[in-house]
Amino acid sequence: MKLPIYLDYSATTPADPRVAAKMMQYLTQDGTFGNPASRSHRFGWQAEEAVDVARNQIAELVGADPREIVFTSGATEANNLAIKGAASFYREKGRHIVTCATEHKAVLDTCAQLEHEGFSVTYLTPQSDGSLTLRQVESALRDDTVLVTIMHVNNEIGVVQDIASIGELCRARGIIFHVDATQSVGKLPVDLGQLPVDLMSFSAHKIYGPKGIGALYVCRRPHIRLEAQIHGGGHERGMRSGTLPVHQIVGMGEAYRIAKETMADDMTRIGALRRRLWQGINRIEAVSVNGSLEHGAANILNVCFHYVDGESLVMALKDLAVSTGSACTSASMEPSYVLRAIGLSDELAHSSIRFSLGRLTSEEEIDYAIQLLQKSITRLREHSPAWRAFKAGSE
């Protein structure tokens, strides 16, 4: 067993060796290095064919038509293109957007930018487990609502939103529905042939693909239109200009192909490991789950260790790679806005740690993590006046 143990798979994953090997075939002179937009020679034709294969692999995992897949530089850009693109194109229809206070910053900051441009945004406060009810969403809709954007799986607490019901509601009202599926695709079944979703954002590096590449699903039936946010060449059917990075696209396609084959077995095994981790942690006094074990994704466990400062705990757990929030905000000393949105105090939010498990996580690593947590928390609480007061009050 190698130390430190990586338990931060929701931040990023290592590229699968098969993905890396595939990508190398599209980088050097000995490989397929051409520009897929160069249609006058074989180098371009081969590159275009590789892109088409990858586009099909991605579409197959999510039950989409390959023509509905638009490549971007990552899920952040896909979210920007979906939200800004739809809002701009349909602005004459309405200028009201509905989202959730626990969305990723890639969605929240994009919505905030649209507020500066004259749009009105309603930020729904989730229930204590992080979920939204259909009634909450329905009550927020207005005559001028043009877009609803709700993530499928929350990156910090793992709660799974009922995107099927929300999508049906939006479809009935003629409102565009966007889903950030960065944390769900390749981990939960997604069938866009059945789901009433208009736009869906994907990433590669969350499921053992390369960083710097993502995609946006843009529904053809009903036909969804977007205003391009990047101009210069009209690539990707005019929705996203820029030379396609063939090696990254091929890597994403290979990662999605592998995920389609292994997802069911992976998540059964990872779910068992998460239960094992929680059973061990739950033997520690004064701990609680943030979110829901029952309605959460199998790979994420967010735990509050009462009477322990989270930053001190992370430092004490130098042999564990874990986080106190999302990777995009982990440098901030502010408590997690997601945990505050579900009702935790700043103190409890600061005392919380996210564990996210992956394809390479082993039972041995989980057992080591449990032992280290038990020892570290006992040691840290020995120096905690709040813990001593709690113990004195409970005796």
From Swiss-Prot:
Catalytic activity: (sulfur carrier)-H + L-cysteine = (sulfur carrier)-SH + L-alanine
Cofactor(s) the record lists: pyridoxal 5'-phosphate
Modification N6-(pyridoxal phosphate)lysine, positions: 206
Active site as annotated: 328 (cysteine persulfide intermediate)
Keyword Transferase: yes
Disulfide bonds: none
Source domain of life: Bacteria
Top class in the EC scheme: transferase
Keywords: 2Fe-2S, Cytoplasm, Iron, Iron-sulfur, Metal-binding, Pyridoxal phosphate, Transferase
UniProt-listed HAMAP family: Cys_desulf_IscS
Protein name: Cysteine desulfurase IscS
Source organism: Erwinia tasmaniensis (strain DSM 17950 / CFBP 7177 / CIP 109463 / NCPPB 4357 / Et1/99)
